[in-house]
Swiss-Prot record:
Residues 22-31 have a biased composition (Basic and acidic residues). GO terms for molecular function: DNA binding. It is found in: Virion; Host nucleus, Host nucleolus. Associates loosely with the viral DNA to form an outer shell around the nucleoprotein-DNA complex and links it with the capsid by binding the endosome lysis protein. During entry, secures the viral genome in the capsid until it reaches the nuclear pore complex, preventing innate immunity responses. Dissociates from the viral genome at nuclear pore. Might be involved in nuclear capsid assembly of the viral particles through its association with NPM1/nucleophosmin. Its main location: virion. This is Core-capsid bridging protein. GO terms for biological process: viral release from host cell. Induction: Expressed in the late phase of the viral replicative cycle. During virion entry, is ubiquitinated at the nuclear pore complex by host MIB1. This dissociates viral genomic DNA from capsid and allows genome delivery into nucleus for infection.
Length: 368
């Protein structure tokens, strides 16, 4: 046996490699014991028995009696009310408005503030629902707000009468053309009582089950002072005798119609605008600016357009042929300096004795 094996056997006898549980270290300090301190009872039991017992004693109030916001818990639609012990309830969600508009009692929910209409910090007195987002009259702009009119007269409501139009909620809104100014439309236009308005009834557009929107366009014919003034102005420019007689008759008819309408609708008299005859415009002294094109050279790949300036660029060929030089003696090639056109300049004296040399510029004939 080797010496190493003998040493291992001797060590196994003296200190065997068997590890038992670790020894616990003895604690040098003792745990401190806390004594409970009992409160002394007041010896006022006899006095309390003689007094009146208060059943609903209130706590001492603060200076400011602040109460938090009263929150009414509302169960959101779509949540499944199932009690599973040991599990949390799922997070609530709001429905998509495509699904909300599919309910048949949509208006009742909005009126009673149920379901999706039960949310919000502030209570809104008037609730509006956008039933239609289309614009059947894009050329008009609104002047007044869209007001809801009662379907029944107040006397009929008092008597408790019911009609077929009880479920209707008609709205009225005044609209004018977009291209006209609002001041001209409201101030200068007058309504002719004799003419009947043009009524156009559009088809019913379904919004929700049992709910639809129908647009009725009522076009009211109006007359403005500007149109009459332009009519008389155009009539006064006629020179032939027959046309002038017809024009005088037309002016008298328009004035008579205006006087009739002014007695009923408008109190101010009609104001006719008399303008001077237009003079013919003189001929121009210069041509169009687009005709003044510079002389330019086109790329060889571009074919020139007939009728326009410009030529195809062709590189100039030298008249003399290039001589072949011997390999021993090569001449140095010099670049030609470009031939520049003479530029007319002018000297401008500035403050401080400085003189600037500026080129003279050619201006367009329309620039003074």
């Amino acid at each position: 046996m080797s010496k190493r094996k003998i040493k291992e056997e001797m060590l196994q006898v003296i200190a065997p490699e068997i590890y038992g549980p670790p020894k616990k270290e003895e604690q040098d300090y003792k745990p401190r014991k806390l004594k409970r301190v009992k409160k002394k009872k007041k010896d006022d039991d006899d006095e309390l028995d003689d007094e009146v017992e208060l059943l609903h004693a209130t706590a001492p109030r603060r200076r400011v009696q602040w109460k938090g916001r009263r929150v009414k818990r509302v169960l959101r639609p779509g949540t499944t009310v199932v009690f599973t012990p040991g599990e949390r309830s799922t997070r609530t969600y709001k429905r998509v408005y495509d699904e909300v508009y599919g309910d048949e009692d949509l208006l009742e929910q909005a009126n009673e503030r149920l379901g999706e209409f039960a949310y919000g910090k502030r209570h809104k007195d008037m609730l509006a629902l956008p039933l239609d987002e289309g614009n059947p009259t894009p050329s008009l702009k609104p002047v007044t707000l869209q007001q809801v009119l009662p379907a029944l007269a107040p006397s009929e409501e008092k008597r408790g009468l019911k009609r077929e139009s009880g479920d209707l909620a008609p709205t009225v809104q005044l609209m004018v053309p977009k291209r006209q100014r609002l001041e001209d439309v409201l101030e200068k236009m007058t309504v002719e009582p004799g003419l009947e308005p043009e009524v156009r009834v559009r088809p019913i557009k379904q919004v929700a089950p049992g709910l639809g929107v129908q647009t009725v366009d009522v076009q009211i014919p109006t007359t403005s002072s500007t149109s009459i003034a332009t009519a008389t102005e155009g009539m006064e420019t006629q020179t032939s005798p027959v046309a002038s007689a017809v024009a005088d008759a037309a002016v008298q008819a328009v004035a008579a119609a205006a006087s009739k309408t002014s007695t009923e609708v408008q109190t101010d008299p009609w104001m006719f605008r008399v303008s001077a005859p237009r003079r013919p415009r003189g001929s121009r002294k210069y041509g169009a600016a687009s005709a003044l094109l510079p002389e330019y050279a086109l790329h060889p790949s571009i074919a020139p357009t007939p009728g326009y300036r410009g030529y195809t660029y062709r590189p100039r060929r030298r008249a003399t042929t290039r001589r072949r030089t011997t390999t021993g003696t090569r001449r140095r090639r010099r670049r030609r300096q470009p031939v520049l056109a003479p530029i007319s300049v002018r000297r401008v004296a500035r403050e401080g004795g400085r003189t600037l040399v500026l080129p003279t510029a050619r201006y367009h004939p329309s620039i003074v």
